[in-house]
C-alpha cells in the first residue's frame, strides 16, 4: 500500500511539484493580507471580567480612553493651544485633551490649581493625551510626532502610551523577521552541508521546507490575524523542528541509492522507509503543539494552530515534494557531491558512557528541586515587556514618566444616574494614595445638574448606553505588585457600592486577568501535552516502559531548563514558559525516538553484543541525526536571542536553545543507562532473556530512521573502503526474498 502510493507520487512527480509551486505562490500572495496583533489583552477569554468590560464599553460609548501621551518641549501656551487644535482635527484622533480642557487659560495660570497645572505642563513644555484608533501603525505614530515637531517653537517630542507600544511591537516584528529568517536559512545550509554528501541536498531540503513555511504563513489568512509572538517565532520554529524529517529522508535516500541502481526505485524505497518514521515523529510534535490550544488564554490557541498546521504542511512537503525534487535534480546533485565532513562519534559515545552513572544520579537528584523551582519563577504578562529598553517608545516613556510621573488610566462603568453610589465610589477612589485624578459626571458637571442642561460633550464622554463612566488615573507602573494590588482594591470598592453591576478595564486590569488565566493554563498545557505524546509513544512502541523512559528524560530536561530563571532570580515571559513546554517536549521526543529506535534495532540485529557495546553503538549511530537536527534548532533560536529586538522573543529563543542542549545531554548520557537497566530488569523477570512487547516490532519496523548519514548511503562508502563495513543479507520479516543492505561493521551481527 505505502509502496504503491510512493511509486504513484514519483511517477507523477512533475504534477506534484507543479501543485506545490501553485499552492506556494497562492500562499505567498496571501501573506500581506494576514494581520498581526501585538495587544495581548485581545487574547483573553471572552468570559474574563476585563474582556467583558471592554466589550460593554465598546457597545455603550463611541470613544475609548486615552491611549497616547504626547509631550512637546519648546512651545508656549498659545502654541500649545494651536497644537491641540491640530491634533483634534486629525481624522485618526478620536479624542484629545490638554491643559486648556482642565483650566481656564484666559486667566493667569499661577492663580489656578497648581496640582492640575503640574499634570499638564512643566518648565519646558506641555503634555497632550490623545485617543486614537486601535488599528494604529508606526507610520501613524510618526505622523503625530511630525505634527508636534512642526508646531511653532517645538524643539523635541516624546510619545508613549499603549497605542505607541503596540505600534512599536508591530514594527519590530517586520524588522526582526528580515534578520532572523535569513540567519536561520544560513544556519540550515551550513549544518546540512556538514551532515550530507552533496552541496545541493541542503538547498533541496530548504526548498521543500520553505514551501511549507510559505504555505503556513499564507494560510493564516483563514484565521484573519495572528499574534506578534506567533508571527515572530512560528516560521523559525517550523524550520528548526521539521528539519529532522528531511534528515531522515536523506538518510534513507542515500542508503537506497547504494541499494538500487534505478533512480526511481531508490526514491520509492526512500519514501516507503521514511513515511512511518516521519509520520510518527511529526505526530509527536503535532500533538505537542496542539496542546497549546487547550489554553484559556487565546494566544495559545493562536500559536498552537499555526505551529501544528506548520508541522502537517512540513510533513506533506518533506514526504511528497522533497522525494520528487531529489529525483528530478539527481544529476546536479551527483555533480556537487563532497566528501564527508563530520568526524566519527565513537569517542563522543565513549565519553558519554564514561559519565553515564554520575549523570543518572545527578538527573534523579535535581529532578524534584527543578520541578518545584519551575513553578516559583517570576513572570511578566504585559506586552510592554516585549519592547527593548533602547526602543524609541521606551525612551520616550522614560522621558514623560520622569517629567510627569508614571500614570495608568482605568475606566469604571457603573449603572447610569445612581448618583449616591457613584459619588460615594468617587470619594473612596480619591482617597486612595495612588490616585492622581478621578473624572466622573459628578466631578465635571455636578451630579445635581440635569443631563439636559449639561455640556453635550461631557455627557457623551461620561454617560451613554445606560452606563456612567468614571476615569481613574493612578500613579503606578503598568505591571508590578502595587498595580496588581490596586486592581483588587478598586474591584472591592466597586463591589461595595454596586455588587456585580460594574465593569473595570485598563491595561493593568487585563494583565491581572492574564496572570490568573496563565496560572491555570500552565497545568492544562503540561497535562495535555504529556498525555497526548505519551499516547502516541505508547501506540508506537506498544510497551509502557519505553515511553516512560523517554518522557522521564525529556521532562527532567524541561524542568531543569525552566527552573534556571528562578535560580538566577530573573523574571521571564510566561508565554515563553508555556511555549517551551510544548516545543522542547515535541522536539526532544523526536531525538529520543531516534535513539530508542537505534538501540532497539541494534538489540535485534546483534543479540551477541554486550549491553555496554550496544549503548555505545546506539549513541554513535544516533549522534549524527540528533546533533544535526538539534544544532539547527539551537543555532536558529540562538540567532533569535542575539538579533531579535523583542526581550520576550529573545527569552523564548534562549529557552529553546538551552532546552535543546540540556535535552541532548540527557539523551546521550542518561537515556542509554535507563535502557540498559530496563533490559536487565526484563531479563531477570523472564529468566534472563526476552524483550518487551513491541520492542521487536518497533526495531524491525523502523528502517534507517535514526541511524545517521555516516552509517548509510554514500557516506558509508568511506567506511566500506576502509574495511569498516560489510554486505550482509537480511531476511525480510514477511519471509520474502532477502535484499542486500549495507551494514557498518559495528552494527553487523558478529
Task: Give the label of every model feature segment.
Residues 46-163, 376-546, 552-567, 571:
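Structured non-transmembrane domains adjacent to transmembrane bundles in polytopic membrane proteins
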Amino acid at each position: 500500500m505505502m509502496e504503491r502510493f510512493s511509486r504513484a507520487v514519483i511517477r507523477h512527480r512533475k504534477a506534484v511539484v507543479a501543485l506545490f509551486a501553485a499552492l506556494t505562490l497562492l500562499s505567498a500572495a496571501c501573506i500581506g493580507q494576514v494581520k498581526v496583533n501585538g495587544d495581548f489583552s485581545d487574547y483573553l477569554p471572552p468570559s474574563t471580567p476585563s474582556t467583558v468590560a471592554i466589550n460593554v464599553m465598546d457597545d455603550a460609548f463611541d470613544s475609548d480612553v486615552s491611549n497616547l501621551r504626547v509631550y512637546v518641549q519648546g512651545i508656549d501656551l498659545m502654541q500649545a493651544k494651536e497644537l491641540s487644535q491640530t491634533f483634534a482635527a486629525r481624522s485618526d484622533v478620536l479624542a484629545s485633551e490638554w491643559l486648556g480642557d482642565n483650566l481656564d487659560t484666559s486667566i493667569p495660570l499661577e492663580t489656578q490649581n497648581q496640582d492640575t497645572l503640574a499634570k499638564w505642563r512643566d518648565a519646558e513644555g506641555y503634555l497632550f493625551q490623545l485617543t486614537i484608533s486601535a488599528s494604529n501603525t508606526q507610520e501613524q505614530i510618526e505622523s503625530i510626532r511630525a505634527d508636534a515637531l512642526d508646531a511653532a517653537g517645538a524643539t523635541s517630542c516624546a510619545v508613549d502610551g499603549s497605542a505607541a507600544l503596540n505600534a512599536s511591537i508591530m514594527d519590530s516584528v517586520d524588522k526582526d523577521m528580515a534578520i532572523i529568517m535569513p540567519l536561520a536559512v544560513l544556519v540550515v545550509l551550513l549544518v546540512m552541508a556538514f551532515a550530507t554528501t552533496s552541496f545541493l541536498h541542503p538547498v533541496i531540503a530548504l526548498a521543500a521546507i520553505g514551501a511549507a513555511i510559505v504555505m503556513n504563513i499564507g494560510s493564516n489568512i483563514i484565521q484573519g490575524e495572528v499574534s506578534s509572538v506567533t508571527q515572530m517565532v512560528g516560521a523559525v520554529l517550523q524550520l528548526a523542528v521539521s528539519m529532522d524529517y528531511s534528515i531522515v529522508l536523506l538518510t534513507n535516500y542515500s542508503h537506497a541509492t547504494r541499494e538500487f541502481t534505478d533512480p526511481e526505485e531508490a526514491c520509492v524505497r526512500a519514501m516507503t522507509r521514511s513515511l512511518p518514521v516521519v509520520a510518527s515523529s511529526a505526530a509527536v510534535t503535532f500533538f505537542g503543539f496542539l496542546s497549546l490550544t487547550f489554553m484559556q488564554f487565546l494566544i495559545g490557541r493562536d500559536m498552537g494552530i499555526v505551529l501544528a498546521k506548520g508541522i502537517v504542511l512540513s510533513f506533506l512537503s518533506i514526504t511528497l515534494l522533497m522525494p520528487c525534487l531529489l529525483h528530478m535534480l539527481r544529476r546536479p546533485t551527483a555533480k556537487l557531491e563532497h566528501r564527508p565532513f563530520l568526524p566519527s562519534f565513537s569517542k563522543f559515545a565513549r565519553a558519554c558512557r564514561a559519565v553515564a552513572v554520575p549523570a543518572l544520579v545527578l538527573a534523579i537528584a535535581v529532578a524534584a528541586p527543578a520541578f518545584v523551582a519551575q513553578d516559583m519563577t517570576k513572570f511578566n504578562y504585559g506586552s510592554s515587556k516585549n519592547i527593548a529598553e533602547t526602543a524609541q517608545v521606551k525612551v520616550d516613556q522614560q522621558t514623560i514618566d520622569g517629567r510627569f510621573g508614571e500614570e495608568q488610566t482605568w475606566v469604571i462603568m457603573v449603572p447610569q444616574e445612581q448618583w449616591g453610589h457613584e459619588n460615594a465610589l468617587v470619594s473612596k477612589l480619591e482617597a486612595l494614595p495612588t490616585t492622581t485624578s478621578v473624572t466622573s459626571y459628578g466631578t465635571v458637571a455636578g451630579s445635581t445638574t440635569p443631563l439636559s442642561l449639561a455640556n453635550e460633550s461631557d455627557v457623551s464622554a461620561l454617560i451613554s448606553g445606560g452606563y456612567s463612566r468614571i476615569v481613574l488615573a493612578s500613579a503606578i507602573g503598568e505591571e508590578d505588585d502595587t498595580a496588581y494590588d490596586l486592581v483588587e482594591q478598586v474591584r472591592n470598592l466597586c463591589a461595595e457600592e454596586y455588587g456585580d453591576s460594574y465593569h473595570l478595564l485598563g491595561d493593568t486590569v487585563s494583565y491581572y486577568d492574564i496572570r490568573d488565566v496563565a496560572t491555570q493554563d500552565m497545568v492544562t498545557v503540561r497535562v495535555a501535552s504529556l498525555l497526548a505524546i505519551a499516547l502516541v509513544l505508547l501506540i508506537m512502541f506498544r510497551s509502557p516502559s519505553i515511553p516512560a523512559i523517554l518522557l522521564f528524560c525529556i521532562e527532567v530536561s524541561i524542568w531543569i531548563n525552566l527552573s534556571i530563571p528562578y535560580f538566577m532570580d530573573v523574571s521571564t515571559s510566561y508565554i515563553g514558559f508555556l511555549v517551551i513546554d510544548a516545543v522542547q517536549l515535541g522536539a526532544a521526543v523526536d531525538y529520543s525516538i531516534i535513539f530508542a529506535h537505534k538501540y532497539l534495532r541494534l538489540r535485534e540485529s546483534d543479540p551477541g553484543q554486550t549491553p555496554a557495546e550496544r549503548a555505545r553503538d546506539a549513541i554513535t549511530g544516533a549522534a549524527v541525526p540528533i546533533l544535526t537536527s538539534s544544532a539547527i534548532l539551537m543555532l536558529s533560536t540562538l540567532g533569535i536571542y542575539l538579533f531579535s529586538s523583542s526581550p520576550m522573543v529573545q527569552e523564548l529563543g534562549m529557552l529553546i536553545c538551552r532546552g535543546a542542549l540540556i535535552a541532548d545531554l540527557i539523551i546521550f548520557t542518561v537515556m542509554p543507562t535507563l535502557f540498559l537497566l530496563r533490559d536487565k530488569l526484563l531479563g531477570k523477570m523472564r529468566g534472563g532473556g526476552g524483550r518487551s512487547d513491541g520492542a521487536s516490532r518497533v526495531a524491525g519496523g523502523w528502517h534507517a530512521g535514526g541511524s545517521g548519514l555516516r552509517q548509510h548511503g554514500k557516506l558509508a562508502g568511506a567506511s566500506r573502503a576502509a574495511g569498516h563495513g560489510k554486505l550482509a543479507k537480511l531476511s525480510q520479516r514477511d519471509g520474502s526474498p532477502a535484499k542486500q543492505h549495507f551494514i557498518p561493521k559495528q552494527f553487523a551481527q558478529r
